[in-house]
Each structure stands twice: as C-alpha cells, then as structure tokens.
C-alpha cells in the first residue's frame, strides 16, 4: 500500500507540474529489443537489455593515451565494460578542440589532445590511422554494447598552458564564429581571451549552425552507430556574459522587431538574473534559450533525416535552477516554470516554449553531487537531481542521470567503492531511462571495475 501511495503521489506531482497534455516517448521498441535496426539497418542483433540501460562515458582527452593509437586496447576494454554490466557506451568523438575522431569531410581529424599522463599535463599525439569511432562500434557491438557518439558541440578550439589546438586556430578567418563575452575589459572575442579552456562558438551564427549540422549528418550516417549525444550545446559561460556577437545582435533585433535599446544587455559582472530584470533582459535570456532550442530541433531533424533509427539526445547539468545562465532550457515545453521554479518567476510567456526535451529521444542529466549527498529531494543531491529531473521533463523523454566519480566533492582521490552499490541502486530506481557514469577514466584510475560489477549485479538480482 505504501508503494502504491508513493506512485500515486509521484503521478499527481507530475500532473500538477506539467500541462495536462497527452505525453509519450518517441523511444522505439526495437532500441531495447536488440533486434537489427536498433542503431541503423547495418547494426547486428545485440543482447536484450535486462533492466534499465547503464551507460559509461568515454571522454576523449582523458582516455586518449589509452585508445588513440591502440584498437586492441579499445576491444579489450569494451569486453571489460560489458562484463561489469554496462549496456551502452557514450564515446566522445569531438573533444573541446573541435577536431574529430571520425571520418569527416568538413572537420579536421583530432591528432592530439592535452591530457594528464603520469602526473604531467602534456600533449598526447595520435599517429594511428584506424577509424577511432568505427573501432569502438565494432568492438562494442562484439561485446554486446550499444555505441553512442558524444560530441562537444559549441566549441572550436582549446587554449592551454602548453599550446593551442583546434579549428579556430587553424582558420583565423573564422574568428567571427567565436563567442563574444562581456568581460571586465569589454566585449571580448574568445580568441582574444587569455583564460585557458575551450574556445566556444557563437550559437546564433548561421555559419556555425550550418557547419555543425553538416557534421551531425556525417555522424548519423556512420555504419552501426546507435545514438548521438550533444555535450556543451550551450553558451560560453555560466555567468550571463556570453552571446554578444554581431550575428547575435542582428538575430536579437529580428526577434524583438527592433534594435535592442542597450548592448550588451547585461551589465558587466552580472552572474545571476537581477531581482527585477528589465523587459529587454527578460527577452534576451529568452532569446538565448530559443537559439539553443531551435538548434537542437534542427539537429534532431538532421540526424533522423539521415537515419531515423539513430537515437538523438543531449547531456545537460541537472542543476536547472540556474541553468538559464548557460542559455539552456532543457525542460519540456509542457512544464510550468513559473509555478514550479522559484528562480524562474521572471520568465516571460515565450520562455516556456524554449524547452527542448520534447525534441529528444533520450537525455542525460549530470547529477554531480558530492559523495556525502547521494540521497535527498533537492538539487545537489544525486537522488534530488533525478527526482526533480523527472518532474521537469514531464515524461516526454527517458532520462539517465549519473555522478561524476572523479571530480565531484569527495570522489577526487578514489577509495569510494563502498558507495557505488547505493549510487547504482538510487540512480536506476529513480531514472526511467537508466543511469550513466562519468567517466571510464575514473573507473580505471581508481580500479572500480569489480566494484561496479558487484553493484550492477546486485541491481540485476532485484529484477
């Protein structure tokens, strides 16, 4: 009876949070059945998934020293990943440099990544010529895993203390593709910013969007690929200072029907929405989310145009309460923001329509809470992130949430094997689309192979 009461309560909560429209996943049965067609017509039959999907992320830079030049190592680890009980890989094939680890006619190949190796930050070079993504697809399928390609989306270069790499450095004529931020020194193109890190692209730039859609079309045509996941599909920063390119100003003027009365819209140093934002500021924040929404919709259409059976999704941080700072609204269009979110009381009517969850086949929520914050009902607890995610998505798309087991508070030095069974159980019991773990490099670094196998085995025994 208590279980029934809990389920009814959860359903009532969803109904009050979301507009009362009929919902339904675009998830196709064959994606779970292991039958041919689950990831394209050329995908061999894969074992049926028992329980909910279990994804492990494979970051390009963090794993580059292992896989960039060794297809045999890829095959060996795919077997180990499957033996742990994972069902899916998300293989990063476009690191933050914007260069790619798959065959492309428009993007340069990734020949080096900056990474920590044996305690030193250095370049790891790729001299091998085998197709990196194809090697993962072949080895993953042979091990019984589904293989999804992850790409860092709105990026085009990486600036580090040991040098620079990426498209924006190789093509100075594309500087106008770069983000422009409202920094202390004034409006600054990302290529003129001294800070290290990714060089972000301008999401409002039509040339940037066309380039990325072409890239996604190439990726969707990859033989045997099961899915595509966009990462960093957002604006440059978390501080409301991004988006002030000439292309964005022109597009914003079109959106308003007039020239903006102030540019930049937000004052320097504004990191959160003001307590009483102006009409222009409300429209600007809505416009940025609309830009991302419209790109995600176009990306989904491009992927499914090339191959209707390739799943399309996005990774986002689960901390939605201030995710407007990145220009992203990952909720469903049906979600009632003003009613349910205390930090979104300022939104105009059009903001709700910028939610892009309805465009997706699956979505990944980064539940990156610390080791002492597994349980709870609020943000910055793993369980709370997942529960709130379910409310915000309104049942329109299956979601997988998961922890960062190497960088989140308390996980940095490993030795957290004892927590993994509880984390696995909590994520899989709370998320309708499974769980994901970030990242494979941390499983290797802290020797969590056996601990994850035990944790997933315990979950499977409950089915």
Each model region followed by its residue ranges:
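Bacterial Sec-dependent N-terminal signal peptides
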Residues: 13-49
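Aromatic- and acidic-residue-enriched segments that line the glycan-binding/catalytic groove
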Residues: 101-114, 155-194, 232-272, 325-337
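Glycine-rich, aromatic-flanked loop segments that form ligand/cofactor-binding clefts
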Residues: 86-97, 132-191, 229-232, 308-313
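Aromatic-lined carbohydrate-binding/catalytic grooves of carbohydrate-active enzymes
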Residues: 86-128
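Active-site-adjacent "subsite" loops/lids of carbohydrate-active enzymes
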Residues: 46-68, 148-222, 274-281
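Catalytic domains of carbohydrate-active enzymes, especially glycoside hydrolases
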Residues: 72-99, 222-226, 352-365, 426-435
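Substrate-binding cleft/loops of secretory-pathway carbohydrate-active enzymes
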Residues: 156-159, 163, 238, 306, ...
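Substrate-binding cleft of secreted/luminal carbohydrate-active enzymes
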Residues: 346-463
């Amino acid at each position: 009876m208590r279980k029934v009461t809990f389920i009814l309560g959860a359903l009532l909560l969803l109904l009050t949070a979301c507009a009362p429209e009929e919902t339904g996943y675009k998830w196709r049965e064959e994606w779970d059945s292991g039958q041919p067609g689950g990831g394209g017509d050329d995908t061999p039959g894969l074992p049926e998934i028992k329980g909910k999907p279990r994804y492990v992320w494979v970051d390009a830079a963090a794993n580059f020293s292992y896989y960039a030049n060794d297809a045999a190592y890829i095959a060996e680890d795919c077997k180990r990943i499957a033996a742990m009980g994972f069902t899916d890989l998300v293989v990063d094939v476009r690191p933050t440099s914007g260069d790619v680890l798959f065959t492309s006619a428009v993007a340069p190949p990734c020949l080096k990544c900056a990474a920590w190796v044996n305690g030193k930050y250095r370049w790891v070079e790729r001299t091998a010529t085998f197709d990196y993504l194809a090697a993962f697809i072949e080895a993953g399928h042979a091990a019984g895993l589904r293989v999804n390609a992850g790409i860092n989306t709105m990026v085009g270069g990486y600036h580090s203390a040991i040098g620079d790499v990426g498209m924006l450095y190789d093509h100075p004529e594309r500087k106008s593709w770069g983000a422009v931020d409202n920094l202390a020194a004034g409006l600054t193109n990302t290529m003129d910013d001294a800070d290290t890190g990714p060089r972000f692209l301008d999401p409002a730039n039509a040339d940037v969007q066309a380039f990325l859609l072409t890239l996604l079309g190439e990726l969707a045509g990859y033989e045997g690929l099961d899915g595509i996941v966009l990462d960093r599909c957002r604006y440059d920063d978390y501080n409301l200072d991004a988006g002030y390119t000439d292309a964005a100003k022109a597009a914003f003027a079109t959106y308003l029907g007039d020239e903006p009365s102030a540019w930049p819209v937000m004052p320097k140093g504004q990191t959160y929405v003001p307590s009483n934002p102006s009409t222009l500021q409300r429209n600007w924040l809505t416009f940025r989310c609309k830009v991302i929404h419209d790109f995600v919709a176009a990306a989904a259409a491009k992927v499914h145009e090339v191959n209707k059976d390739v799943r399309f999704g996005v990774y986002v941080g689960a901390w939605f309460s201030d995710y407007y700072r990145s220009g992203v609204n990952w909720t469903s269009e049906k979600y009632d923001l003003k009613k349910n979110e205390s930090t979104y009381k300022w939104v105009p009517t059009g903001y709700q329509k910028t939610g892009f969850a309805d465009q997706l086949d699956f979505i990944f929520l980064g539940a990156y809470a610390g080791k002492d914050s597994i349980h709870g009902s609020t943000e910055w607890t793993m369980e709370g992130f997942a529960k709130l995610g379910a409310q915000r998505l309104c049942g329109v798309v299956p979601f997988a949430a998961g922890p960062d087991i190497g960088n989140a508070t308390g996980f940095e030095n490993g030795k957290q094997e004892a927590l993994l069974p509880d984390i696995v159980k909590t994520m899989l019991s709370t998320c309708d689309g499974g769980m994901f773990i970030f990242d494979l490099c941390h499983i290797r670094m802290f020797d969590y192979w056996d601990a994850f196998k035990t944790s997933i085995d315990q979950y499977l025994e409950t089915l």
